[in-house]
């Protein structure tokens, strides 16, 4: 399901048998209609970014709900798929902040310790937030609580009102929070553009004696 260390830590913040409830939910959801991402990618964020390597969290809300977009990493799409509007704006801010990145699959961020997590890990095709409030929030809140317990600093990048509510779980003074409006077209001009989250994250990591992220990779 997830990287084994993640699994053990997350379980400590969940009611007994919650993983069984998740599996039952997934069985029913994927049997009853088209759901994104593909089932093998539901926990991809936790599979490709081990807990011990995680130094940044970028929190999304739920997966893209269009064909072939969602790949289990927040905001990322496969290279052959056109970038959705929020990702276009993320890459625009990255270009203004650090430099241009000519591809929009963010897997290389995940392999550098950037946990690309959605608060809701599945979505019915064509229905944004269609699985919100059903099963996922206690699980992904537990992920944030696990990160909060880390001894090494983590930079939490929270875009938009929904993500910013999760600050309540970030109580460890070792960690850092970068927050701004969401990169969606509706809010990007209200403070997302110009917020420089990428250079700010690297400045924090380097000040903490950690390696910055190669955001252009």
UniProtKB/Swiss-Prot annotation:
Q: Which UniProt keywords apply?
A: Cytoplasm, DNA damage, DNA repair, Hydrolase
Where in or outside the cell it occurs: the entry states: Cytoplasm
One GO cellular-component annotation of the UniProt record comes to: cytoplasm
The yes or no answer to whether the keyword Cytoplasm is present is yes
SMART domains (alphabetical): UDG, UreE_C
The UniProt entry, under NCBIfam families, shows: PRK05254.1-1 (NF003588), PRK05254.1-2 (NF003589), PRK05254.1-5 (NF003592), ung (TIGR00628)
What is the similarity comment for this entry?
Answer: Belongs to the uracil-DNA glycosylase (UDG) superfamily. UNG family.
> HAMAP family this protein is in?
UDG
> What is this protein called in UniProt?
Uracil-DNA glycosylase
Q: Gene encoding this polypeptide?
A: ung
